[in-house]
Regions:
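Active-site-proximal, substrate-binding regions of enzyme catalytic domains
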Residues: 38-39, 57-112
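C-terminal binding/interaction regions
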Residues: 135-137, 145-158
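Short, well-structured N-terminal submotif of metal-dependent ribonuclease cores
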Residues: 1-59, 69-82, 155
Length: 158
């Protein structure tokens, strides 16, 4: 999930198939890019103003990425604590969606651009289960598979 990421994006760079969005869905790769990689566009999208949604999966994956960074020697213990505090602040500002049975059922069905890994499918299914029209949602991601599917499903991508 934390592989190669696209260049930093700004609001004006958001790929929007049908107008402006009213809230953002934060996918794990964007949160990790904001907190660990210094991606200014991701940081603005993740920590800036506005309404945000995320899956509980987003915060589990992000916390694991922080732990891996410390274990790999990229962070010391104090750096890990600082980033985890920032992650908790992001989580507190989000409406967090549980990984529910309907999300898992949707994740098990095909998406427009296959193959899709299971965790990516859970993110995409979570967005769909929010029940909003795609024109109202921007998906914030640095993951190519999420980006391709989000655009194919009619969502704006940042």
């Amino acid at each position: 999930m934390v592989g190669k990421r696209a260049r930093a994006r700004t609001d004006k760079d958001a790929e929007t198939p049908a107008g402006g969005a009213s809230f953002r869905y934060l996918e794990s790769s964007a949160v990790v890019a904001a907190l660990l990689d210094g991606d200014a566009g991701a940081r603005h999208a993740v920590e800036g103003e506005g309404q945000r949604f995320a899956s509980a999966l987003t915060f589990a994956e992000s916390a694991r990425a922080v732990l891996r960074a410390r274990l790999a020697g990229h962070l010391d213990l104090n750096g890990e604590r600082t980033i985890l505090r920032r992650l908790r602040r992001v989580e507190q500002r989000c409406q967090v969606a549980a990984i529910s049975d309907p999300v898992l059922a949707r994740a098990s069905r095909p998406f427009p651009v296959e193959p899709v890994r299971t965790l990516d499918a859970i993110h995409l299914a979570t967005v769909e289960e929010l029940g909003e029209t795609p024109q109202l949602i921007t998906i914030v991601t640095r993951d190519r598979r999420i980006r391709e599917n989000a655009l194919a499903m009619g969502y704006a991508v940042e």
